[in-house]
């Protein structure tokens, strides 16, 4: 709600921090970027450069008609039933999602009605539609929209779908990962500790940056619990804080050593998926 208000007032255009940084030119004079996440990788593993899903945000309003739920429910149009049907319609689409596309749809009902003895006429839903590529995001999103509209149509309700720019999938850049791996070994990690690449079906705004410049986004262990939950906690401060900082600092040294030869080679071989201008037009 806070970011929505900022957008309404014109302070921001996108909800993602790095999307705003791209728009405002923060990366215009940046050749490459790196960051890391910590998560429960199991036995303190390091994922050198996991790919991720992108997503499209979605706010949905089902509009029905109020009536007394006890004495005359037949005079109303139940917007909650429309929402429930819509969710089940998406479930019926799941067999059409290819495994390689890693599609995810996980809605929540943020408003299910107003009072228990009135047929719900205003029901709100929020969700992300996630997938592995831009094309599969667009395809899954079209199927989800169709399913949502069918739920409303089935009970005679109306529907309003507001789509919000989400994040793009993270792209791997092998040349940068090779530099990182050398430094992971230098700080004492072994082959048993390092997982090449990685597969993550969550989403990061860093994925947007990876479409424009070479990026590196390793994931380190040192935590327990699922991301964004109450159970998430730092389990090993050395591994969660110091190891990533050391590995990435050493990677910067290697990239800039010898008049930045390594960095220049990476840039020469890099072909951006989008220019900044193309990215902003797409968003």
List PLM regions with ranges.
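Metal-dependent amide/peptide-bond hydrolase catalytic core
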Residues: 84-283
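Histidine/acidic-residue-rich, glycine-tolerant segments that coordinate divalent metal ions
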Residues: 1-106, 113-118
